[in-house]
Amino acid sequence: MQPKDLAKKLFSEKFNRTSELNVYAPGRVNIIGEHTDYNDGFVMPCAINYGTAVSGAKRDDHTFCVYAADLDQFDRFRLDRPIEQNPSEKWTGYVRGVVKFIQERCPEFTQGADLVISGNVPLSSGLSSSASLEVAVGKFCQQLGELPLSNTDIALIGQKAENKFVGANCGNMDQLISALGQQDHLLMIDCRSLETKATPVPHNIAVMIVNSHVKHDLVTGEYNTRRQQCEAAAKFFGVKALRDVSIQQFKEKEAELTALDGEAAKRARHVVTENQRVLDAVDALNQGDISRLGELMGQSHDSMRDDFEITTPEIDYLVELAQQVIGKSGGARMTGGGFGGCIVAVAPVEKVEEVRKIIADNYQKRTGIKEDFYVCTASQGVHLC
């Protein structure tokens, strides 16, 4: 059963009434532009046909009573008192954090509700289960309280909840694409100005996602370390963010930065070149040049492996297998925060079964882990359902 249907069904079972408000927000896959969002750079994701549904109805008090279907757990908190962490259950932080920061923007929002949350984005896969949850809860609150918040506002509140309440220093891409995604389009997002540019996905091209089932947890260490290294490099260049450094400027000072901090230099090289790759990818797509897009995806993966150092042997192997089949007809790369998670591959529809087969025949044999294979559709962002 799809999350939309399951959330409605479970709501009537758990609360003995019919839901009045149903919201759905998708997960996402990022085609190119990794670890560029928190450097004020460019990204090119699409919303996918996996996501989080919230079904609920008003209460006649100020309490939020939340049931997480996938975990079979309840959480209760009041909106007429300061919202605190619930240290025993991590998932509650995403919900409480969003409500807390909505109240910061709209202090009049104290309307209680019963709600059920159900999702089918694989957890810790790098497909943004957390952002789709935040955006779904944010939209639910906006509708519940008839609050003057745009979908962009909701996305930024979701990011703030993850940064300040959950403690993961993510950028804004995941929430923005979940809030603003367009059916059958990739969305190039300028993470500084928040401008977006939709580019259609050619109808004969498939977007495949393969979950390595090597788990990552961004709240711990490595992700936040990368962010600090990027900030240190920006400081070295005397700019607000690495977005402001061109490839030419980077090359001029690369040796100096390397002597000072070799790791920061490698991280900066990835971000500076990755921003350019996103802009080049938009041009390639507009010209229908999927071969060029694939080439850029390959360069992106190499840069994440060698300069940003966030891939794993299992992820590298999945990319290698997919690439053997795809050749110059598309591309494959790791997607998401890194240290496991998923790869994304873009190729003609007729290559899908061949890619699925080479991975099924080889990945588990080498790694001892069974992968999951998804063919995705570029989907609409958050909406009522």
Swiss-Prot record:
Q: What is its EC number?
A: 2.7.1.6
Localization recorded for this chain is:
Cytoplasm
Listed GO MF terms: ATP binding; galactokinase activity; magnesium ion binding
What does UniProt list as catalytic? D174 (proton acceptor)
Signal peptide positions (record): none
Report if keyword Iron is assigned.
no
Major subcellular site: cytoplasm
Broad enzyme group: transferase
**Database matches in InterPro entries:** Galactokinase, Galactokinase_bac, Galactokinase_CS, GalKase_N, GHMP_kinase_C_dom, GHMP_kinase_C_sf, GHMP_kinase_N_dom, GHMP_knse_ATP-bd_CS
Record keywords: Metal-binding included?
Answer: yes
Gene Ontology cellular-component annotations: cytosol
For the site labelled Transition state stabilizer, the residues are: R28
Q: Which residues bind Mg(2+)?
A: S130, E162
Which pathway is it part of?
A: Carbohydrate metabolism; galactose metabolism
**Which BP terms does GO give this entry?**
galactose metabolic process
Kindly state which keywords UniProt assigns to this record, in alphabetical order.
Answer: ATP-binding, Carbohydrate metabolism, Cytoplasm, Galactose metabolism, Kinase, Magnesium, Metal-binding, Nucleotide-binding, Transferase
- Which residues are listed for ATP binding in this entry? S124, S125, G126, L127, S128, S129, S130
Q: Which residues of the sequence carry a binding annotation for substrate?
A: E34, H35, T36, D37, Y223
Q: Quickly give the catalysed reaction.
A: alpha-D-galactose + ATP = alpha-D-galactose 1-phosphate + ADP + H(+)
What this chain does, per the entry, is described as: Catalyzes the transfer of the gamma-phosphate of ATP to D-galactose to form alpha-D-galactose-1-phosphate (Gal-1-P).
The entry's family comment says: Belongs to the GHMP kinase family. GalK subfamily.
Provide the protein name: Galactokinase
